[in-house]
Amino acid sequence: MHLMLVLLGLAALLGTSQSQTGCYGVVNRIDTTGASCETAKPEKLNYCGVAASRMIAERDLRSMDRYKTLIKKVGQKLCVDPAVIAGIISRESHAGKALKNGWGDNGNGFGLMQVDKRSHTPVGEWNGERHLTQGTEILISMIKKIQKKFPRWTKEQQLKGGISAYNAGSGNVRSYERMDIGTTHNDYANDVVARAQYYKQHGY
């Protein structure tokens, strides 16, 4: 009896740790075609797809690891898979390497997650917890819009739709298969998901 209670307690504990980052789906369950050739070419890659996404993510890994603790903290706080946050950071700013004084996109995008000052008021330091929290909350708001728009989609499909909407807005997501048409290089969610799956394998 005592052993059963211990096992039940352990199961509850493990369940809690899983749910702390899995509220919006599990990134490894999402299908992805990876980066388009349009995304791969500026990275000087002569191939496209998941392999290209993984290579770009690998190049960003050392810079990303500086923020690993922070990314995991924000992910657990907001119940979002830290690997997804890392995937977005890689795509948006190459983990900060593409930024000038914390800004990108011709001075419109702020921080690691490139919060657009035309739509939001950026908060915190470009590489700090408040910024990552704001970026992740924007992602969550997009996921919730997709949940409302496509209630019959699986959790993972809604997560992928939310990632796509993070780039081009929920109005751009019209179907699962074509959600990335209209995003930057027409591959945003597929590329981010493939990068996130790479980061998942590296402890995010």
Curated annotation (Swiss-Prot):
A single BP term in Gene Ontology: killing of cells of another organism
Keyword Transferase: no
Gene Ontology MF annotations: lysozyme activity
Gene Ontology CC terms: extracellular region
Signal peptide: 1-19
Swiss-Prot/TrEMBL keywords: Antimicrobial, Bacteriolytic enzyme, Disulfide bond, Glycosidase, Hydrolase, Secreted, Signal
Short name of any one Pfam family annotated for the protein: SLT
Disulfide bridge partners, by residue number: 23-79, 37-48
Family label: Belongs to the glycosyl hydrolase 23 family.
Protein's job: Has bacteriolytic activity against M.luteus.
PANTHER family reported in the protein's UniProt record: LYSOZYME G FAMILY MEMBER, LYSOZYME G-RELATED
Protein name in UniProt: Lysozyme G
Species name: Dromaius novaehollandiae (Emu)
